[in-house]
Amino acid sequence: MKRTIPVIGMACSACSANIEKKLNSLNGITSASVSLPSRSALVDFNPDEVSLTDMKAAINAIGYDLVIEEGRSAVEIEKRAYTLLKRKAILSWIFAIGVMAISMHWINFGNNNTSNQVALLVALGNMLYCGKQFYVSAWKQLKNGLANMDTLVALSTLIAFLFSVFNTFWGEAVWSSRGIVWHTYFDASVMIITFVLTGKLLEEKAKDGTASSIREMMGMTPKTAHIVDGDKVEEVPISTIEVGDLLEVRTGEKVPVDGEVVWAESFMTPNAAYIDESMITGEPNPAKKEKGDRVLAGTIPNQGKLRMRARQIGKDTMLAQIIRMVQEAQGSKAPVQRIVDKAALVFVPVVSTIALVTFLAWWIIGGNAYLPQAILSAIAVLVIACPCAMGLATPTALMVGIGKAAEEQILIKDASALENLRKINALVTDKTGTLTIPNKNIDFTKSDNLALEERETLKPNAREAMETLQKNGVEVYMMSGDKEEAAKYWAEKAGIKHYQSKVLPQDKENLVRRLQTEGKHVAMVGDGINDTQALALADVSIAIGKGTDVAMDVAQITLMGDDLRTLPEALQLSRRTVRMIWENLFWAFIYNIVCIPLAAGVLYLFDIDWQITPSWASALMAFSSVSVVLNSLRLKLMK
């Protein structure tokens, strides 16, 4: 059984890695994949061995939460959390301005000791209210032998605060008596929390954009429907509709569920209505619907009205299945992400070790006079290290890429399919139903090219799609059960050089296998049961949405419409998405590789008197996460 479960409380990639590790350790769970940007866990489990309650208890123990209750809305929880985060960020800035005013002597309390004590109270208030979640999370992580970004924030702010408290009450006696100049660093502890909260606020806002495609699809389902009861038509909540109910859909209204037309009329046609299905199929022209035709939830009659019998409701509608498929794809992981997750698990311990080494190096080399510098350098290292940027690099790009594909009526089942599609350099395609549309009225007595045209029609834009693929370095192979004459004719019409005639289902599979042995990365496009063997064997399998359910079940990618130009679009989107992933990872790693030494004070080795302070470190850390998300969102703007 597969289920996507909302997760509450994740802050960085170490969080998602810890949750994933915990879930995978439970008996009865076949696999679990946790996505930071989608805030969800995709879990494949045996309900007889492990329950959702068991999972929730295990995740609660390490400081997070799963939303499994029916009446509990993850969206509402996230909205409340965002509002609270916003309030804390604003209040933290007020605390920060106050502490900065005291430390810069803009506010004078008569003597330094009083000023330090006031700053202590302000910083303590900021930590207890605005920064409370960091310390609670860090403590829960510590109890379970884990660590995440909250651990770094909690550790760095506590060190800065406690060292400042020590200096406030004992600085004169301990340091001044030894001729050492001392300071308090309450401003550092406050500014770290302030910048981290601000960064998280901006990050949440930016991440919200990565999920816009799913929200738009969810918005396609109406909240109410018109049910026909005898001579009465009344408006009812969509949740009350049952299979078999008779519904009425008027011009401009959304079809509430999947069903079968029992009556239709329009101004142009007495016994038919015209429905806009572009949001599902991508077809720009309205589809004519008569008695007995199928209608889909979320589509809109733009000419006429109809009555329909409900056949699939709730989670069984085509729209609900599409949404579920996209959510699962966005929650799945590309192979490169699994490497990043392993790095995230050791990232915080490694950074903590670097911070300790930094502290000891400054203290041993400089002695007690450099103890404040040693502490500040260690704090800066703890703060500037950012596992978030690495953790967000892959999933945010995948979420945007898969969401954009869905907007183009390209449904991608998992992240590996999107990643593998960019490598494709050979495409095997079925003919009938994939490249051509069979005509209903066929005259089998004719044998010339005119007869071929009468039997089936090349899909609009099929030739353009095949030529675009070949220009992009993809060799196209057409497989047909037709005789040589017909296969050659349609291959030429579609602009395809390689073709085979009189093929059986195993011949398609054999061609895919042969191309793979030649070192090619092969995609297979088909629409029928006779294509499933080849689809299953191909590196990337692509089904036509109007084909059989069997083909769509086997395929990793489904094209919902008949416009084959979505094939090269999918290839282009795959290449852009993977390029974006590597861009994000490159800058995330470069950020940590460059900034951690600068925070430690490495430039002093070259007689350059400069390093990144804890306050600036927190600002840079926040910016690094936001920049990764914003960079991924550029995919939405690419044509």
Stretches with model-predicted labels:
Residues 54, 58-76, 119, 123-224, ...:
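Actuator/coupling domain of P-type ATPases
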Residues 139-144, 205-220, 396-415, 632-639:
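Juxtamembrane helix-loop transition segments at the membrane interface in multi-pass membrane proteins
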Residues 108-111, 143, 162, 404, ...:
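Membrane-embedded alpha-helical bundles of multi-pass transporters
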Residues 4, 27-49, 53, 183-186, ...:
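Conserved cytosolic catalytic loops of P-type ATPases
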Residues 1-116, 216, 232, 268, ...:
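Flexible metal-binding regulatory segments at protein termini and peripheral loops
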Residues 280, 376, 386-451, 534, ...:
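Conserved catalytic phosphorylation-site environment of P-type ATPases
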Residues 17, 38, 267, 412, ...:
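Conserved ATP-binding TGD loop and adjacent catalytic N/P-domain core of P-type ATPases
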Residues 90-98, 338-366, 378-386, 391-396, ...:
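Bilayer-spanning, highly hydrophobic alpha-helical transmembrane segments
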